[in-house]
C-alpha cells in the first residue's frame, strides 16, 4: 500500500495539535511489522484515554479536565471544612468554667457525687461536671447550674473552684416570716434563720458534708420604707436565689433599683439563661428579694415573676456550692 503524502505536513508543523478538531477525524497508525496501517477514529482514541464520561460522579461531565477541576475545587472546600472542624474540636476540648458555662447540654451525672467529679471541680477543669448536667440522688434531681459562679467574690476572696447546684424541685414549703413583715430583709427572716436548716441537712446527706462549700455572701439585712436598705458579708453554705440569678434582672424586687438584694449575685445562672424552662417547675417558690414591707418575691407556678405575703408557705428551692 502506498499513501500520497505530497501535500502532507509533519505533526510538528501544526501550530497546535488541536487542528485535529473532529471526533470523525482519523489517525493512521503504521503496523509494527510494516505490513500496513490501521485507521483509528479520533473519537475512539478520546474514549480510550478519558473512559466513559457518563460514569463520572461529578456534576460536570463535559470533559475529564472539567471533572478533575471540580474534584480539586471540592477538595479545597473540604479542606476548609476540616480546618473549621479542627478549630471547633479544639474549642470544645478546652477546660475551665467558661467552656462549661457556654456549651450547655443536658447530661446524666449519675446517682452520687463521686470523688472523680469532686477532683474535676476542685481542679477547675469541669470536664466531668459541666453546666447542664444533673444527678439523681436519693430520688431528688439536682442541676449543675453555673461553674465558678462566685469565684473571686467576697470580702475574703473565694479562690476555690466550685459548681453552683440547685434542686429541680423545692425540698419543701416554708414561710419567709410567721407574719407579713419583711423586717430585717432576707438575712433577718425566719427563712434564713431556721427555714433552710432541713435543706442544708438534705444536701449534706446527698453530696457529703465535706463537699458543701462554706463561703462569704453579701446579704440584705435591713428594710426601710418597704425597701432593703442595708447589707453585710456573712458565712453561708446555702441560700435562696435572688431575681438576678433567676431572671437576669429585677422584676418586683429592688424597689427604687437599690442593689442590696443583689449583692454579689448579679448575673443570671448559665443554666437558666440556656434553659429558661427549668425556672418554671409548676411550683411557687421563694426568692430572697424584698418587694415591700410585707412581700417577698417568688417564682409563680404559672411561670410569672411575682411577689407574695411573707407568711405564705411557698417552695424552698435554694442554691449551694459543691466542690
Where is each model-derived feature located?
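Fibrous stalk/shaft segments of extracellular and virion attachment machinery
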Residues: 1-90
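Collagenous Gly-X-Y triple-helix signature in extracellular proteins
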Residues: 79-323
Amino acid at each position: 500500500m502506498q499513501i500520497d503524502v505530497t501535500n502532507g505536513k509533519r505533526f510538528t508543523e501544526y501550530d497546535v495539535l488541536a487542528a485535529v478538531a473532529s471526533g470523525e477525524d482519523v489517525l493512521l497508525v503504521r503496523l509494527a511489522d510494516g505490513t500496513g496501517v490501521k485507521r483509528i477514529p479520533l473519537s475512539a482514541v478520546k474514549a480510550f484515554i478519558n473512559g466513559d464520561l457518563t460514569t463520572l460522579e461529578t456534576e460536570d461531565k463535559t470533559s475529564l479536565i472539567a471533572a478533575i477541576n471540580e474534584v480539586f475545587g471540592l477538595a479545597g472546600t473540604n479542606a476548609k471544612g476540616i480546618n473549621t472542624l479542627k478549630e471547633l474540636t479544639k474549642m470544645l476540648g478546652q477546660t475551665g468554667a467558661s467552656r462549661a458555662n457556654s456549651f450547655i447540654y443536658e447530661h446524666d451525672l449519675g446517682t452520687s457525687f463521686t470523688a472523680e467529679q469532686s477532683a474535676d471541680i476542685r481542679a477547675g477543669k469541669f470536664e466531668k461536671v459541666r453546666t447542664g448536667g444533673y444527678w439523681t440522688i436519693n430520688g431528688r434531681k439536682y442541676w449543675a447550674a453555673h461553674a465558678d459562679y462566685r469565684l473571686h467574690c467576697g470580702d475574703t476572696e473565694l479562690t476555690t473552684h466550685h459548681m453552683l447546684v440547685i434542686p429541680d424541685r423545692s425540698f419543701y414549703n416554708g414561710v419567709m416570716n410567721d407574719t407579713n413583715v419583711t423586717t430585717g430583709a432576707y438575712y433577718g427572716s425566719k427563712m434564713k434563720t431556721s427555714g433552710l436548716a432541713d435543706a442544708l441537712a438534705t444536701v449534706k446527706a446527698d453530696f457529703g458534708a465535706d463537699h458543701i462549700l462554706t463561703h462569704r455572701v453579701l446579704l440584705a439585712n435591713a428594710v426601710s420604707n418597704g425597701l432593703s436598705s442595708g447589707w453585710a458579708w456573712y458565712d453561708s453554705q446555702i441560700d435562696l436565689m435572688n431575681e438576678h440569678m433567676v431572671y437576669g434582672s429585677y422584676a418586683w424586687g429592688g424597689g427604687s433599683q437599690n442593689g442590696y438584694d443583689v449583692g454579689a449575685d448579679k448575673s443570671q445562672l448559665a443554666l437558666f439563661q440556656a434553659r429558661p424552662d427549668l425556672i418554671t417547675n409548676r411550683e411557687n417558690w421563694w426568692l430572697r428579694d424584698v418587694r415591700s414591707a410585707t412581700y417577698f418575691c417568688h417564682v409563680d407556678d404559672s411561670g410569672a415573676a411575682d411577689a407574695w405575703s411573707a407568711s405564705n408557705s411557698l417552695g424552698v428551692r435554694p442554691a449551694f456550692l459543691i466542690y
